[in-house]
Amino acid sequence: MNIIRKLKPGTISLVLGPMFAGKTTFLIHCIYMLERLEKKVVFIKSTKNTRDKTIKTHSGIQLQSKQCEIIESTQLSDVGSLTDIHAVVIDEAHFFDDLIKCRAWADEEKIIILAGLNASFEQKMFQPIVHIFPYCSWIKYIGRTCMKCNRHNACFNVRKNADKTLILAGGSELYVTCCNNCLKKQMY
């Protein structure tokens, strides 16, 4: 199915999944499609994500766009005017406590596309994601295979160290995504 048919002005689309599932890759694909339709796109990333200043996936895929503006912010309410923008794309949406701000942008007839984790390392949903759910006209779940057994669908994000900080940006050096069987066996 062509995703572009789902991305309508005034709607919020949400892409969820565990780490390393391809959510950012999906967003990059959406940005390219929107740009082909001559839509002005802004990509918002959290300053809490300290891994890279560009739009780049864990697997190294990087957005190659001269038109897409990248905004780094701690809160969405700090983002300036988006008057001339057609689409707002937000990666790591769970990092934004004021994710509900997207509703106001949707009311301004902007296309909103969010990507975030399905759950924390404690296997609990992030509250900003929970609060935006009722306003999403389309929700997509992207899964991946367990990084330990390579047999089952993985939906659990597990931190490799004992740090209990809720938000701790990192990649495979800090996290593993595993299935329920490996989580129960603590095979990470």
Swiss-Prot record:
ATP binds at G17, P18, M19, F20, A21, G22, K23, T24. The active site is at E92 (proton acceptor). GO terms for biological process: DNA biosynthetic process; thymidine metabolic process. The keyword Transferase applies. One of its GO terms (molecular function) is metal ion binding. The keyword ATP-binding applies. Disulfide bonds: none annotated. Signal peptide: none annotated. Its EC number is 2.7.1.21. Keywords: ATP-binding, DNA synthesis, Kinase, Metal-binding, Nucleotide-binding, Transferase, Virulence, Zinc. Belongs to the thymidine kinase family. Phosphorylates thymidine. ASFV replicates in the cytoplasm of infected cells and contains genes encoding a number of enzymes needed for DNA synthesis, including thymidine kinase. Important for growth in swine macrophages in vitro and is a virus virulence factor in swine. This is Thymidine kinase. It comes from African swine fever virus (isolate Tick/Malawi/Lil 20-1/1983) (ASFV).
